[in-house]
């Protein structure tokens, strides 16, 4: 449990880079569409290369698993990654990095409250500690948030709240369907791959709606892919594996 908690805290640290870089890309004129899509466009080849270098038959194992239940993988990968990161990027466009980071912590409570969907009772002790953490975060940010208009808060908070629910939901549903031999790295790669139809459609829409991304946004997206798409996601999913 202590290792899982430490991994979760470390994942939050890496996620913080995402909020800062997303806000920076927005202030630089970049669209949330490309902030979202480029992260996964870059994350996929990075994870592919890691699995290839690692050997141990990981790529073949995850491809066989996806072929065994393709619709399950497509659906829950879209929920866990598509409906997580697209709304998160949209919310980051309307809110400061501190507001996005604080609101994102709702995912701690959301993960606990989703427990009955997987045939288990809500662990009240974990829920209690999660609520303490969440309340503490919002108390620290309340005075600054009070200075914002309701419209600004709603535009930032609603997409982030959706993301905070979809992220643990998609992850834990696929944990149910994956056999034990599928590692965390393999599952993250599989979800990234199977969410690609969503990102390709969103990217095609983005070309027509906002044009192509700038070179600066592309470069910053590589950083997001490394910090959030690889490091934070692997740590978060590994921590979830440890406590399931």
Which residues does each PLM region occupy?
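Hydrophobic alpha-helical transmembrane segments in multi-pass integral membrane proteins
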Residues: 83-89, 137-149, 195-210
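Hydrophobic transmembrane alpha-helices of multi-pass small-molecule transport proteins
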Residues: 47, 125-144
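Specific alpha-helical transmembrane segments that line the substrate/conduction pathway
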Residues: 34-41, 88-121
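Helix-helix packing/entry segments at the starts of transmembrane helices
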Residues: 11-12, 38, 99-106, 173-196, ...
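Glycine-/small-residue-enriched transmembrane alpha-helix faces in small-molecule transporters
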Residues: 1-38, 78, 90, 135, ...
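Transmembrane alpha-helices of multi-pass small-molecule transport proteins
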Residues: 28-83, 110-114, 132, 165-170, ...
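A helix-boundary/kink motif common to multi-pass secondary transporters
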Residues: 30-32, 96, 123, 182-183, ...
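Specific transmembrane alpha-helical segments of multi-pass solute transporters/efflux pumps
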Residues: 14, 19, 52-104, 139, ...
């Amino acid at each position: 449990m202590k290792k899982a908690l430490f991994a979760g805290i470390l994942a939050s640290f890496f996620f913080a880079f995402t909020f800062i870089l997303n806000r920076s890309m927005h202030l630089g004129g970049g669209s949330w569409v490309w902030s979202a899509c480029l992260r996964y466009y870059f994350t996929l080849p990075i994870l592919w290369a890691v699995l290839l270098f690692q050997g141990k038959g990981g790529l073949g194992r995850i491809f066989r698993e996806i072929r065994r239940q393709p619709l399950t993988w497509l659906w829950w990968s879209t929920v866990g990654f598509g409906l997580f990161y697209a709304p998160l990027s949209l919310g980051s466009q309307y809110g400061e990095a501190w507001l996005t980071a604080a609101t994102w912590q709702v995912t701690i409570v959301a993960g606990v409250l989703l427990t009955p969907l997987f045939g288990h009772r809500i662990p009240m002790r974990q829920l209690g500690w999660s609520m303490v953490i969440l309340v503490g975060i919002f108390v620290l940010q309340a005075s600054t948030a009070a200075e914002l208009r309701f419209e600004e808060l709603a535009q930032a908070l609603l997409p982030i709240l959706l993301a905070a629910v979809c992220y643990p939901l998609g992850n834990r549903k696929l944990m149910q369907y994956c056999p034990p031999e599928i590692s965390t790295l393999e599952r993250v790669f599989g979800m990234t791959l199977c969410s690609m139809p969503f990102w390709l459609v969103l990217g095609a829409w983005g070309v027509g709606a906002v044009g192509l991304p700038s070179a600066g946004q592309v470069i910053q997206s590589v950083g997001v892919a490394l910090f959030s798409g690889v490091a934070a996601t692997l740590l978060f999913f590994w921590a979830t594996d440890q406590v399931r």
